[in-house]
Curated annotation (Swiss-Prot):
Pathway: Cell wall biogenesis; peptidoglycan biosynthesis. It is a peripheral membrane protein. Cell wall formation. Catalyzes the transfer of a GlcNAc subunit on undecaprenyl-pyrophosphoryl-MurNAc-pentapeptide (lipid intermediate I) to form undecaprenyl-pyrophosphoryl-MurNAc-(pentapeptide)GlcNAc (lipid intermediate II). It is found in: Cell inner membrane. GO terms for molecular function: UDP-N-acetyl-D-glucosamine:N-acetylmuramoyl-L-alanyl-D-glutamyl-meso-2,6-diaminopimelyl-D-alanyl-D-alanine-diphosphoundecaprenol 4-beta-N-acetylglucosaminlytransferase activity; undecaprenyldiphospho-muramoylpentapeptide beta-N-acetylglucosaminyltransferase activity. It comes from Ruegeria sp. (strain TM1040). One of its GO terms (cellular component) is plasma membrane. GO terms for biological process: carbohydrate metabolic process; cell division; cell wall organization; lipid glycosylation; peptidoglycan biosynthetic process; regulation of cell shape. This is UDP-N-acetylglucosamine--N-acetylmuramyl-(pentapeptide) pyrophosphoryl-undecaprenol N-acetylglucosamine transferase. CDD domains: GT28_MurG (cd03785). Keywords: Cell cycle, Cell division, Cell inner membrane, Cell membrane, Cell shape, Cell wall biogenesis/degradation, Glycosyltransferase, Membrane, Peptidoglycan synthesis, Transferase. Its main location: membrane.
Amino acid sequence: MTQKLLLMAAGGTGGHMFPAQALAEAMLRKGWRVKLSTDPRGARYTGGFPHMTEITEVSSATFARGGLLAKAMVAPRIAAGVASMAMQMRRDRPDVVIGFGGYPSIPALGAATLLGLPRMIHEQNGVLGKVNQKFATRVAEVACGVWPTDLPAGAEGIHVGNPVRAAVLERQGAPYIPPGDYPMSLLVMGGSQGARILSDVVPGAIAALPETLRRHLRVSHQAREEDMARVAQFYADAGIDAEVQTFFADVPSRISEAQLVISRSGASSIADISVIGRPSILIPLATAAGDHQTANTRGLVEAGGAIRIPESALDTTSLAEQIAAVLTNAEGATQMAHAALSTGIPDATERLVARVEHLSEEAAP
């Protein structure tokens, strides 16, 4: 029997790449071949993909960036990417093509549309990204990570949840150690691209905590490269035990060990936090398209597993108060952890696998 081929296309952020990685792991176990099409930014996240994943980089571009000349070159680059991908697909025909969003997914989805191949998209957020918005009515279905998801008329949406990596599933529902008079871990995540506002506000908020609480904290803080030195220096000057990095390869482990997570509310972060089950303070990105990061928080916040602070209300004083409220109330923190866990969809990958297999079977002669 011929080995089936899944072609995945994903843009260059962790929010797109991590669900693709989870699907790759599962489909390889099912005996499928798996190809990943991404751009140089996305290639930074491929170190965690199974080694059997066939990875190619494509020509694409982001419409929103650059001056007039740069923007004038976008369409030719994307057209070249679609043409190149169509040639590859003719030589090595995928059984299913799935896009996870981001401009680098345009060549694969565009070529699959031209060739009439079975195709679908996975949308991680409660509001469709620009690329997924364009293709939502041109694919068989939209697998949705958050429900409800705003979909255009004519699009077929199915709730599957957001797939999480094997390293997250290994820690699914890991026992929560409530805060107390002993070393506690606090994880600060700005999403795969970091977040300057967290680097501006969080260190000061931690420094403003009572010394009786602050002395127990061990902070892991993800920051942009340009912010690393000043953030690390601030923690050092304040006598706070902190590790500052641009990217933590062991985020699932750090979430599991944390008494509290402070994070942006990208879809992958929300999925990881809820599947493992940890209290969180979430600060949605104010400029996120369609305010999708606020939409992503609804399930966790309404269940009582998270505290949401809009960027407009974020300052050191208010954040310090919320941190203290969680870390000085062991019973309340434990309830938050259980509530977060109740919102997780640990079988999201299996649900997405089922949709891929269904689409493949529907298209079979």
